């Protein structure tokens, strides 16, 4: 086992894709531009610990993009022959080995720091006897204890990287392999030492494909002004298309925003169904004429877009953040520059071939692609750590 020195990344870069030059066309995550299989991939068994957040069991029942990604990733890594141990709260729910971090954190505390800090503080002890080559941390606070457990660490930035979070991730990138979800996210923090860009993925066979769609459009996500629920209502009504709204609405800020800005607009052609998961979520995704994604922030990725596409459902979205990297305009959906363009795009959703939507997910955004990309990052991270640990000649 190689002990991480915290300095191995100085002057060193690993990546699943080359940097794009200034002004070049944005590369689509998962496309071949991210590179072929690493010819240096070894045959030695790779041992990885994947750390999930403290908020939900894996796999999640309803909302939980990070948890869904972690669940699909560890299962796909196991299928590739990687020895994976999942560190997560609650009960064992994947094919990976499991080490519980404790009970699921109180959902009333979601968004607060203490559960994250307590979760992170346990990691050195939990990792001490696992003998892993690399730790893949998907939490916010967990990377802060990397120096304590001394293991090479890969950190995925699952959220925004601007402002104070940018300062945080920039500092982390000095001693850990920092992974972006998209080129857009990476571009929001160009001063960080990004190690790789690895787009999210889903397991396609878990999403029911439907070629024939119903009339409704779907808004699915989190109840926040960033996600554009009011813009979704306005667009659907302007297009004369019924809208089904399903969103996580648990935290105080989410509830307050819903009651103030969204609830007064409901009724008639706009149906609120609350937070959904399981079969209900899949049926809504598969039956919708389109997923409406009118975001008002720099979205790092947008997992719900590839979930919809896996069901053969096109995406109608605003051009913010990673949207142009995920949605192929005119092939898997319509990317609009202004909210006023959304109604017309919704009326053209039938022009998108559902089979193309599914094919893009299978080719670029599958769990198999996700695992292959991360295995490449893990192996390179371990190799850099071994090289740094060698005594100077």
Map each language-model feature to its residues:
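Catalytic cores of nucleotide-sugar-dependent glycosyltransferases that transfer UDP/GDP/TDP-activated
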Residues: 2-5, 10-393
